[in-house]
Amino acid sequence: MSIRPLTLNGLDEPETSFEELNTTLPRFQSHETLTLEENVPPLSTSTYIPPPSSVGTSDTGTVFSNSTSAFWSNKQADDDQDMEVDQDDEFLNDFQEFQNKKDDFDDAIKTNFHLRNGCRTGPFKNDIFAEEFDRKLSLEDKPRLKQPRSMMELKPKRKLSNSVTSRNLRSGNSVRFKKSMPNLALVNPAIREEEEDEEREREDQREFNYKIDNDTQDTILAKFSSDDEGDFLTGFEELEGEAIDETISSNDKESADHPRFLKKSSSSLPLKISPAQYDIVKHDELLTPGLHRRQRDWNTQQELDSFKEKRSVRHCSNQNVQLNGPAKIKTIKQQIDHNTPMKKGSMIYNPKTMKWEGNENVLSKFSDVDTANRKALLIKNKLQRDADSKKQKYSDLQHARATSRNQKVIGNMILDEQNLRWVSVSEEEADPFAGIPEINLPPVGKSMKKRSSSPFLRSKSQVNTPFVSNDNDGVYQSTAAQARLRKYHSMRTLNGTTETPEISSTFHLSSRALEKFYHEENRWCKKLASWFIPRDETIISVDEETIMDESTVNSKRKSYMYEIRNMVINSTKD
């Protein structure tokens, strides 16, 4: 196989991919190079960038090219070259990079290396390849392409003259601490009083050991005795022939003992601790009033005046006081209280009696509500009640007509503003209960003289009830709990004969309802059997000829109920 130089101007390189690469290359004998520097354009403002190295294959041969030259290999076999290639195979197999590869692809790479090493004609030399290889392996900084920088990198390196940001206002040399992190050197939680006393003793000892002779002014005697500093400074000998600098002050002496470059100890720094952590001793000359604890004897005015600041007060005489202008008279507003008479509609408040007046007609309806002699369930005569109501309505209407000024009158009708309706002036109102017959009930005392029995038979247990009392004569008499007045009337008497009752019954009750009422009454009597004493004052016998008034009987019969209620409530509390 022979290699000849390839002209790049007339070469049409086919577009191939890595999969289409033909690696079955025959051996070749000789090789030639083609210089690419002839096609380099003349130097201008822009530099020339050589093309990268590439490998192209076709049916006729393979083309190898780099930045300086191009090579073309033919498919003609040569037996003389096989021995050299075998030697190269043995040499390349020693490297790990060229192992476990395909034979055809390895041959192409070997051929490329062989052409580079064997080429001696032309500008391409082995030294150029070695320099490029060394340059790629070097770890020095290389010029890179410009990458997009962040906003922090784009900030100016120097401070702007007119900038008022917080970063420019801070000094660059000072050390900044976060506000959330306090300076631990300023806060010492443990108060080391013993070390402070020792330090005071050391200072007193140093001042005592400094003795300056005013007559000679040529010697300084100093002696340091400290447990912490050791015994390496036991003292100084007399210094003869050396003049003393009189300009040395006490501050310079202190700076000599404590150089400026040394950091101050935490004990010398001020402690920021509240006075509540100390046990403050009462001392009027040293302590401020803010540090004093409150004493009980400070409640007097004299003790409190001791804390006032003494200032010169100028007293102005009343004669020299003059008003700059006329004073404004404020409006006097009356405050509403219980002594202020008021009016609201037709009602007038009387401050003397502290009551509202003007509704006496309305209050008259409630005058007989709380009377003591009023019967609770007494039904009045309907005719009398209707007559009273008509008179009251007529009087109210006449009063309303007399008092009202702006009355609306249309024809024979007048407006009733209280009930919001039209009323005839001449005619009276129609009675809505006209035509209903009245029921006149006889007195209760006369109707209950005869005792009535229930329409059903009683059992033996019910007959022998425990609610009996033994009289002195040995005759059993019924108690008030057993002999209740019946609220109903039956058709059967004690002898079993049917008689027409004197009073017609108002309500018709069935025998089942009457039996239910009877059993409930007996059950109630059993529960209250042990709560009463026989022959009590509240006991009312049915056999008595004279029966008291119904209101008096009911009041006596119900008087014990509140006593029972109070006893039950008190028993549950215990």
UniProtKB/Swiss-Prot annotation:
Taxonomically, the superkingdom here is Eukaryota
Q: According to its UniProt record, how is this protein modified after translation? A: Multiply phosphorylated in a cell-cycle-dependent manner with the major phosphorylation occurring in mitosis.
List the subcellular locations.
Cytoplasm, Cytoskeleton, Spindle pole
Where is this protein chiefly located? cytoplasm
Subunit relationships = Interacts with BUB2.
Q: What else is known?
A: Present with 1380 molecules/cell in log phase SD medium.
What is known about what this protein does?
Answer: Part of a checkpoint which monitors spindle integrity and prevents premature exit from mitosis. This cell-cycle arrest depends upon inhibition of the G-protein TEM1 by the BFA1/BUB2 complex.
Task: State the protein's name.
Answer: Mitotic check point protein BFA1
Source organism (scientific name):
Saccharomyces cerevisiae (strain ATCC 204508 / S288c)
